[in-house]
Amino acid sequence: MATLEDKLQELLQPSVEDLGCELWGIECQRSGRFFTVRLYIDKKDGGVTVDDCADVSRQVSAVLDVEDPIADKYNLEVSSPGLNRPLFTLKQFENYIGQDISVHLRVPMLDRRKWQGKLEKIENDMLTLIVDNQPQVLVFGNIQKANVVPKFN
């Protein structure tokens, strides 16, 4: 069964691409009676500007008003992924092999939900993180949330 995020990705991706941006990912979050739809956009040829976010917000709002895929009232947020960019797809993870990432699991592994380490490799939906000099194999489907850990020199 497709999630709301999957449905929104399919619905909104063409509109975002028409504006010269990539739809990096979508988060839907409920906090009390408020519902937030957060879109992360990126550009291959440089950084995302405030104008890019405003243009995407206007375009996406129009599509959502017509298609009406969200039953509740919601707030729409559009931003760049930022330095600690969230990772949503295996392809995105592949781009960060050799870098530190932080992962939150749906179901604990070895009594831990939170893991941080160097992403060593990806094979058959399995990610290998080096944590405290030990390889830890995580199942992609068990990842609730993941982010790149920025390095500051």
From Swiss-Prot:
Subcellular location, record wording: Cytoplasm
InterPro entries assigned: Ribosome_maturation_RimP, RimP_C, RimP_C_sf, RimP_N, RimP_N_sf
CDD domains: YlxS_C
One Pfam family, short name: DUF150_C
GO cellular component: cytosol
Domain of life: Bacteria
Transmembrane intervals: none
Biological process annotations from GO: ribosomal small subunit assembly; translation
Keywords: Cytoplasm, Ribosome biogenesis
Cross-referenced PANTHER family: RIBOSOME MATURATION FACTOR RIMP (PTHR33867:SF1)
Function: Required for maturation of 30S ribosomal subunits.
Family: Belongs to the RimP family.
Protein name: Ribosome maturation factor RimP
